[in-house]
Amino acid sequence: MPKSEIHPKWYPDAKVICNGEVVMTTGSTKPELHVDVWSGNHPFFTGTQKILDTEGRVDRFMKKYGMGSADSATSQETKEAKESDK
């Protein structure tokens, strides 16, 4: 016989909330689950090429490894300035 009162409370109709909307219900140990991305707005499932850039991480990576960035004109000016200094 399993011990009583050691298991968490089970919510069979837990709401999954994304951007303030209830997107689905599922079973969970919490009554509400707040998510940033789910299959309804994920680029892989929607077929869109949207970069979810949180706190400029993509731009920092692009600048660090010289792969261009959103401000490609600025990076071109910087390269030209470095070449003229030589």
From Swiss-Prot:
| Cited function | Binds the 23S rRNA.
Regarding protein family, the annotation reads: Belongs to the bacterial ribosomal protein bL31 family. Type A subfamily.
SUPFAM superfamilies xref list: L28p-like
PROSITE patterns assigned to the protein according to its UniProt record, in alphabetical order: RIBOSOMAL_L31
Q: Where is the composition biased (Basic and acidic residues)?
A: 77-86
Q: Name one Pfam family in it.
A: Ribosomal_L31
According to the record's subunit comment, the protein's assembly and interactions are: Part of the 50S ribosomal subunit.
Query: Gene3D superfamilies under this entry?
Result: Ribosomal protein L31 (4.10.830.30)
Biological process according to GO = translation
Return the annotated region ranges for Disordered.
66-86
- Which keywords are on file for this protein? Ribonucleoprotein, Ribosomal protein, RNA-binding, rRNA-binding
A GO molecular-function annotation = rRNA binding
Please state what the protein is called.
Large ribosomal subunit protein bL31
Cellular component GO terms, alphabetically? ribonucleoprotein complex; ribosome
